[in-house]
């Protein structure tokens, strides 16, 4: 959530930068309500001063002219009633301003290029080479079904579309990837968390999933209302909600494995086959809490930590700096890591790493003291996939496929696979 006073004091500049994100953004009501809020504050303060003066006058009159007290009491009641009415209206105005702020995305950082969509993203680095396959490569779902290790048909029977059963060695590969990723990240100073998969509404509000993206969430019907997490970012970021951290403890780094659940409300007709866009998928998430002036450096480090998984797996990839029109709601700066998929003959996102500034921390009330005894200030939060496990499985299937339909297992994963070096049809 943006800072109320900053939006009001720098309204034109904030609106201009937000408009580079695209979409329809009407902040006219914000200006009107903020002006009313200011007037109400002035009025309430003035009335409170009148009430205080009336109280003092009553004390004086009680000694000098007791007969005048009735008139003064009437005036005091009228002033008190007016204060009560204006304070009630002030509460309504502030609640409405808060509702507006909850729907406004983060302001892009000045280093983020302007643009309307993916075509305006900027490549900042590239690693490795595309595999030199001397045959027509297959897509991952063709390979998985031929291996007898991906079963979309039975999953549809059980759960409907956009689900799958992993089977045999491919199920083990997915599990091996999770352990491998966690091992790599914890070796770099990340602390592993195993989070809850169901969270409260205020938890989803804290990271910015709600209220704007409620249609893309799965939720329970009972009370209290709970949501299945769309990413471990949600519970892990809120791990420090309503807390004041000590500056010397920052940056705090967490990694967490979890299933992720998404309704994919706007994905009709997109990636209908395979593992790219599922209602349930696995992900290892990276989350950081940083000093305000150091979060951009932490974003660079986090992005490299995610890329390191792909380097160790020997998979060609590139890093893209997202333009203003392609960034997520809570992010002020984002790098997408895109992996090459020979079967699709295209790059596909396997990780998004974002610096959210104080946007989430303001919602979740996550603060820190730079020095002991200092006034608390909002922390900066960062998050990124390290990596999306299903999409990493896709990348292995397509990049390590052989002409006979078997798939080599990357050397780094062989110890996690009990020495197994290839996937062969069941």
Curated annotation (Swiss-Prot):
InterPro entries cross-referenced by the UniProt entry: aa-tRNA-synt_IIb, aa-tRNA-synth_II, aa-tRNA-synth_II/BPL/LPL, Ser-tRNA-ligase_type_1, Ser-tRNA-synth_1_N, SerRS_1_N_sf, SerRS_core, tRNA-bd_arm
Location of this chain's protein in the cell: Cytoplasm
Pathway: Aminoacyl-tRNA biosynthesis; selenocysteinyl-tRNA(Sec) biosynthesis; L-seryl-tRNA(Sec) from L-serine and tRNA(Sec): step 1/1
Gene Ontology MF: a single term: ATP binding
Residues the record lists as binding ATP: 262-264, 349-352
Domain of life of the native organism: Bacteria
Purpose: Catalyzes the attachment of serine to tRNA(Ser). Is also able to aminoacylate tRNA(Sec) with serine, to form the misacylated tRNA L-seryl-tRNA(Sec), which will be further converted into selenocysteinyl-tRNA(Sec).
The name this protein goes by in its record: Serine--tRNA ligase
Organism the protein comes from: Myxococcus xanthus (strain DK1622)
